[in-house]
């Protein structure tokens, strides 16, 4: 099953301008525990910087959300 369909089946609609990220970077691993929705800009940063685990991704999301709220 397509990873986006897997995500939507479990979590509902993907927000506009958000992407689904494979946490382990393995696009064949479509287990729901390996999928996370992210704003597109955060997704780009993850792939450019090589953030590899959920903890680092969560820190990045918190920083993004904090910056969005203050701007």
Predicted regions span which residues?
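Short, cationic Gly/His-enriched loop motifs
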Residues: 1-63
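Intrinsically disordered, low-complexity terminal/linker regions enriched in Pro/Ser/Gly
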Residues: 62-71
């Amino acid at each position: 099953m397509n990873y986006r369909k897997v995500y939507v089946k479990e979590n509902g609609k993907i927000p506009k301008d958000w992407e689904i990220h494979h946490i382990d970077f393995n696009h064949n691993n479509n287990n729901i525990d390996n999928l996370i929705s992210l704003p597109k800009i955060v997704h780009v940063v993850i792939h450019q910087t090589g953030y590899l685990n959920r903890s680092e991704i969560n820190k990045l999301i918190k920083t993004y959300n904090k910056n969005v709220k203050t701007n």
